[in-house]
């Protein structure tokens, strides 16, 4: 028999009647029966179905039936996604608007409930109940109220957003609506601070984008190759990035940046400058929160370069502020380690180079930036000349000038200026600590080039914004990365630089201002300097050698060219022919590939149609399964009614049913109703037991009063009973004595009768003892024989064992005596060798002493001869000096 279905107009009218009498569940069931009909969506237009759909969604929102709303929305989409997209969009927007309004109303209700509780008693603001609740659950009244009132509606709104996104993700006609709902979901997460839902929403959107990229050939599917789709996805990811930054979910922000970069790389046209500026700004913020100052400065530099090139109306103040931001971010980058490859030993998944390369791709850089390259780019873009004088001086002091004694004082003045104008320079305040660390490292490097050692006290005077613990940590980090040779002497409270002249860990490449190399570096470069000097000397001694070699080489090259020119000419012609053939081959391959691509496209289209047909069949099967489930539900409802009718015939059943309304009964099944009946029966039993206990208490009081009245009567009864018991005991005792006397007489007679048996007993015992004694003597003889044999055997064994022990002791003593004699011989031989060595040493010393004395005598003789020669020279000099004067005087005469 066919199922009876109402027309949509009649169903809507009947649903309104159910709503008026306060039965929204019955109204929703009525509308749902219409949607389950297989023929309604092919018979009626959207003008008839749309009002019914709005009422259907209104009831779903009122009753928080998100799964039922999802079923109706999917049915409505299948009908009107190709016929009237505007109707589908209006229905979805209306559904979400109703859910948002109810959620906002629940939020206002929750706040109002808390306000009423707070204003209930002004004298007792903190009640004992509120104190206990806050101590137990750690929540205040607002949190508890939100969990009770607001949270169900928040959950319903979140499910509604997810259902709508899942509904529209593959429909190219509703693509704009899909992205609008995604932005609405981001606003929902921001408004209610739902971080977990935000992460799930990001994963869902990322999964949808991956599905679009994998399959884009469906009839109504979304194609990522269209520029409009790419722009919508890009705008949604930018909105996602802003929301993630506002919620401080930096991991999701980084994933959004990767998605944005992928979409921009996929797009054939260049993104607009405003989008790129927003991208670089958010990227710099994410890098800053991640503590990656190098890429943070690189992103700011890209933003500065883009703004300067494309924004023509940029004022001088804005340009100066941006330049100062870029310059300070670049100068605050920590000085690089000499061996960054050491970091790979503590990495868990990827090497630092791979991570840096991946981040460089996000910035559009061919290779990862470095501090030196960024400073070089800053100078190339003339950034130091665009900033104010104080920041220009900051650059010169850190990167150009060499003045370690005044470096920190100068930097401190810049830091004080930034801190004093913190309201104006809010962007520069986060760089103060990094700037101080870079300054201290610069100070240590410059001090190491001037001093070999310095005291901690003096170094702390030069670095006023650093304490001894921070300074020692920086020194240890410098040594750990092999940047410098530093030795800390805590006993002297001093620091020594470059004291190991035989060791240099790396080639010295000065980064920043430098005066001279370290002593260890000077020792290391001696061979290089020697090679340079020798090369120059050779060029001076043989100035024409290099010219002759070049002329000879040129002659050889010309001769070689004439030998191979014909062969090379033929090879070039052959290569041109190969290139032409290769072009023809590639063209044929391209044509074949295009044909194959067209054929593959047709196959994919056919498969897409088959998949769509299969999906429709699955939906049809799902509807049939849902209908079957509804029939089962109807059977359950029928059994429920029968159970309710059966229970209503009992007194406790009527009492239980009177506590439930019609809606509450519908929510229960037969088992739950039976359980409720059992609970009601148990409750009645407990009430009966309490009544019985109260009656028992009354009876107890009455019984106690009766006992008090019975006490005198019991005392009289006990006195009479004692007299009767005494008489009974006396008669019983007399009877017992008489019986004992008679029993003794019988025992004496029995003893006299048994004494006649004593001789027979003694005779039997003597015979038994003789028999046992002979047996004992026989066993004793056997034991003594066995004992004697065992004693002889053990004596023989002991003699053999002792003889062997004496033999082994003799052998050990003999061996020890031999070893002792060998040791004595060895010691004697060693003593003789030592004596001989001592004698040889004395002989060598005597010979050395003799040679020394001969050498001293020879040296004395030589000195005496030199002295005499010198005296002769002096005497001759004096004579030569006297003779001219004498000759001159004689000539004058």
Curated annotation (Swiss-Prot):
Compartment annotation: Cytoplasm
> Region Disordered: which residues?
592-634, 837-893
Q: Which domain of life is it from?
A: Eukaryota
Domain PCI spans what residues?
319-502
Please give the biological process terms from Gene Ontology that the record holds: formation of cytoplasmic translation initiation complex; regulation of translational initiation; translation reinitiation
Where is coiled-coil annotated?
A: 576-707, 784-881
Q: Which InterPro entries match?
A: EIF3A (IPR027512), eIF3a_PCI_TPR-like (IPR054711), PCI_dom (IPR000717)
Secretion signal: which residues?
none
Q: Which Pfam families match?
A: eIF3a_PCI_TPR-like, PCI
Which Gene3D superfamilies did the record assign? 1.25.40.860, UVR domain
What is a single cellular component term in the Gene Ontology annotation? eukaryotic 48S preinitiation complex
State how it assembles.
Component of the eukaryotic translation initiation factor 3 (eIF-3) complex. The eIF-3 complex interacts with pix.
Q: Which family does it belong to?
A: Belongs to the eIF-3 subunit A family.
Q: What is this protein called?
A: Eukaryotic translation initiation factor 3 subunit A
């Amino acid at each position: 028999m066919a199922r009876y279905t109402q027309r949509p107009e009649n169903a809507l009218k009947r649903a309104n009647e159910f709503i008026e009498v306060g039965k929204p569940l019955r109204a929703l069931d009525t509308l749902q029966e219409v949607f389950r009909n297989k023929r309604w969506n092919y018979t009626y237009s959207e003008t008839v179905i749309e009002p019914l759909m709005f009422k259907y969604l209104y009831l779903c929102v009122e009753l928080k039936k998100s799964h039922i709303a999802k079923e109706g929305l999917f049915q409505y989409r299948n009908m009107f996604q190709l016929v009237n997209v505007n109707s589908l969009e209006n229905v979805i927007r209306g559904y979400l608007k109703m859910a948002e309004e109810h959620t906002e109303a629940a939020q206002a209700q929750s706040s109002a409930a808390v306000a009423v509780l707070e204003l209930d008693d002004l004298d007792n603001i903190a009640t004992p109940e509120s104190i206990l609740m806050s101590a137990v659950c750690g929540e205040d009244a607002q949190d508890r109220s939100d969990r009770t009132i607001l949270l169900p509606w928040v959950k319903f709104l979140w499910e509604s957003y997810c259902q709508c996104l899942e509904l529209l993700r593959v429909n190219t006609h509703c693509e704009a609506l899909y992205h609008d709902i995604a932005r609405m979901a981001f606003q929902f997460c921001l408004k209610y601070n739902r971080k977990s839902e935000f992460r799930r929403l990001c994963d869902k959107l990322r999964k949808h984008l991956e599905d679009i990229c994998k399959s884009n050939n469906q009839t109504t599917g979304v194609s990522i190759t269209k520029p409009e789709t790419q722009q919508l996805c890009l705008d949604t990811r930018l909105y996602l990035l802003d929301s993630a930054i506002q919620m401080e979910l930096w991991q999701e922000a980084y994933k959004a940046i990767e998605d944005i970069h992928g979409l921009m790389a996929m797009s054939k046209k260049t993104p607009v400058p405003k989008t790129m500026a927003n991208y670089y700004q958010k990227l710099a913020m994410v890098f800053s929160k991640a503590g990656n100052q190098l890429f943070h400065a690189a992103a700011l530099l890209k933003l500065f370069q883009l703004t300067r090139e494309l924004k023509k109306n940029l004022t001088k103040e804005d340009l100066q502020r941006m330049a100062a931001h870029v310059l300070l971010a670049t100068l605050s980058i920590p000085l690089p380690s000499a061996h960054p490859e050491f970091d790979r030993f503590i990495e868990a998944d990827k090497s630092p180079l791979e991570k840096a390369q991946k981040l460089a791709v996000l910035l559009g850089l061919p290779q990862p930036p470095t501090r030196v390259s960024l400073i070089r780019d800053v100078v190339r873009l003339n950034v130091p000349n665009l900033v104010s004088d104080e920041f220009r001086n900051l650059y010169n002091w850190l990167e150009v000038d060499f003045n370690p004694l005044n470096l920190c004082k100068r930097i401190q003045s810049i830091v004080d200026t930034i801190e004093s104008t913190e309201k104006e320079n809010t962007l520069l305040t986060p760089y103060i600590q990094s700037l101080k660390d870079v300054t201290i490292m610069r100070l240590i490097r410059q001090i190491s080039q001037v001093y070999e050692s310095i005291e901690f006290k003096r170094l702390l005077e030069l670095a006023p914004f650093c304490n001894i613990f921070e300074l020692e940590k920086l020194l240890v980090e410098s040594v750990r990365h092999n940047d410098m040779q530093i030795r800390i002497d805590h006993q002297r409270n001093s620091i020594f630089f470059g004291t190991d002249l035989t060791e240099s860990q790396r080639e010295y490449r000065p980064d920043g201002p430098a005066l001279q190399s370290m002593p260890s570096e000077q020792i290391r470069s001696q061979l290089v300097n020697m090679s340079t000097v020798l090369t120059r000397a050779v060029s001076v001694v043989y100035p024409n050698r290099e010219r002759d070699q070049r002329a000879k080489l040129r002659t050889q090259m010309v001769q070689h060219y004439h030998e191979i020119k014909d062969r090379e000419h033929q090879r070039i012609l052959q290569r041109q022919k190969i290139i032409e053939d290769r072009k023809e081959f590639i063209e044929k391959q391209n044509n074949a590939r295009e044909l194959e691509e067209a054929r593959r496209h047709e196959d994919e289209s056919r498969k897409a149609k088959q998949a769509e047909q299969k999906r429709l069949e699955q939906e049809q099967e799902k509807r049939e399964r849902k209908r079957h489930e509804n029939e089962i539900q109807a059977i359950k409802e029928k059994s429920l009614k029968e159970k309710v009718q059966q229970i209503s015939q009992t007194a406790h059943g009527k009492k239980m049913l009177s506590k439930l309304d019609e809606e509450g009964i519908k929510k229960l099944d037969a088992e739950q109703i039976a359980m409720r009946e059992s609970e009601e029966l148990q409750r009645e039993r407990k009430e009966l037991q309490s009544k019985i206990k109260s009656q028992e208490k009354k009876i107890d009081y009455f019984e106690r009063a009766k006992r008090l009245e019975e006490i005198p009567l019991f005392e009289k009864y006990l006195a009479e009973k004692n007299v009767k018991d005494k008489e009974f005991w006396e008669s019983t005792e007399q009877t017992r004595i008489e019986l004992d006397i008679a029993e003794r007489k019988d025992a004496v007679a029995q003893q006299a009768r048994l004494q006649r048996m004593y001789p027979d007993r003694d005779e039997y015992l003597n015979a038994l003892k003789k028999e046992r004694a002979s047996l004992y003597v026989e066993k004793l003889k056997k034991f003594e024989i066995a004992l004697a044999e065992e004693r002889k055997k053990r004596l023989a064994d002991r003699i053999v064992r002792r003889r062997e022990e004496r033999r082994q002791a003799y052998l050990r003593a003999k061996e020890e005596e031999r070893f002792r004699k060998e040791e004595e011989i060895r010691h004697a031989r060693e003593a003789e060798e030592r004596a001989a060595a001592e004698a040889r040493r004395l002989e060598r010393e005597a010979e050395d002493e003799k040679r020394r004395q001969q050498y001293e005598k020879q040296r004395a003789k030589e000195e005496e001869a030199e002295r005499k020669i010198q005296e002769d020279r002096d005497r001759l000099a004096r004579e030569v000096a006297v003779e001219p004067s004498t000759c001159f005087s004689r000539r004058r005469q």
